[in-house]
Amino acid sequence: LTGPASPVPVHSRESLTVRCSYQTGFETHKKYWCKGGFWKNCDIVIKTSGTEGETTSGRFSIRDEQTQQTFSVTMTGVTQEDEDTYFCGVERFWTADDMYEIKVTVLPGKVHIGEIHSDSPMLTKHHLQFLLMWGYPKALYL
């Protein structure tokens, strides 16, 4: 089982998609995304049914692409609390699951600047610019 090099950075409030690849012969085995600490006691966040396709649960989705022997996990609306050690996992019979460790680091949210124009005489004189920083808009008159 392989995946991306750690750590995997993501900005707060954005989405993260991680792709893991598994060996031939494990196509119909269940795949999962597990959060926390050590592989033996991590919490399974989302799991496939063992068939090809996508499963969604809250902010998490997992898609098994069996013909390509890969599965991808997407986490939306990432917050600082999502920063942790995760594992891509493939269930195996009669032995320990195959797992790949990935450290996810959450970076501060990006700054987005946009400009709004209006037909209002008041706003045509003063373009209203919004600064979105840390998720809170602040209006500035220019």
Labelled PLM ranges:
Residues 13, 21-23, 36, 63, ...:
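Structured beta-strand/turn binding interfaces of compact recognition modules in eukaryotic regulators
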Residues 24-59:
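N-terminal V-set
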